[in-house]
Amino acid sequence: MVGKDCVAIACDLRLGMQALTISNNFPKIFQYGDVFLGLTGLATDVATVSDLFRYKVNMYRLREERNISPQTMANLVSSSLYEKRFGPYFVSPVIAGINQTTGKPFICGFDSIGCIDFAKDFIVSGTASDQLFGTCEGLWEPDLVCPNCRIVMLGRILTRTAGPRGPLRDHFTGAAERYRPRRTIRLGSTCLHY
């Protein structure tokens, strides 16, 4: 989600299939310098693609002697996925970052063969993307400042699916699990658990 001079990216940590939960600590967002890459899809391909881009970004940093920009990372992801178009990775990447030269936020998404979907407001990906589009359209506002962008991402979206101490129910995909907040943020009278 894009705000005014800021960007926020969020995901769940659940690894599973329908009602079967394998892990509650599976990373899906990876940081490459100042750029964040979110990967949804097949777990083995998520691990493979994240390692592949870690290697390519490190090679870029050594060759160019600077960190990769979000736009360059988008082109790298697109060309790398297109190389494997006849045997694609089953992932749907999302890139979020701030261009260090212009200071402008940048987000984009991809399909499994590298077609770039640029956006100026928000990008969603994964099994619940159809439902998340409606939720994000209702909650996104132009020119959100940085703390408000995080509040929208964490507070509004997550509190609509979780009670304060009850079970966390993923209304979009139908998986239920016990809700245990990992961190609590107090903002005035509002308390956010995530």
Question: Which residues make up each language-model segment?
Answer:
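Long, low-complexity N-terminal extensions
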Residues: M1-Y194
